Amino acid sequence: MSVALSGELQGAIYAALTADAALVALVGSEIYDAPLPSGGALPLGEHVTLGEEEVKPFDTITSSGGIHNFDVVVHSTANGFGAAKDVAAAVGAVLIGANLALVGGHLVSLRFLKAKAKRGVAPELRRIEMRFRAVVEDI
């Protein structure tokens, strides 16, 4: 089943990001796997959210799994891109090639696909959308 490990993969990604000292030094505890409450103020500085995910089957004759393309988004209230890019680099350092443990499956690979830096309007002045690909195999 191609989406069977989606929740477990998201949990492992979140755990890896929140456990990384370099990333936490940049954003503190401002790492979210759910949308921020509507109407609430954005955290000042930078924060990270887990974004959208698209899953496609990755099945062979002997096994089944999924290709998970997912976004991690860096948000910033700063005027320039510098701080947001530092956070994006830290996110990449955590995830690219990571060996995340999955109880119900095996992470075959985790790689970076692309990033897009955008200017926004106050209060979110900068945003970097990072896309990653995880290939997982059910066990």
Which functions belong to the PLM regions below?
Residues 57-60, 78-79, 137-139:
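Short, cysteine-centered beta-strand-loop-beta hairpins and adjacent loop/turn segments enriched
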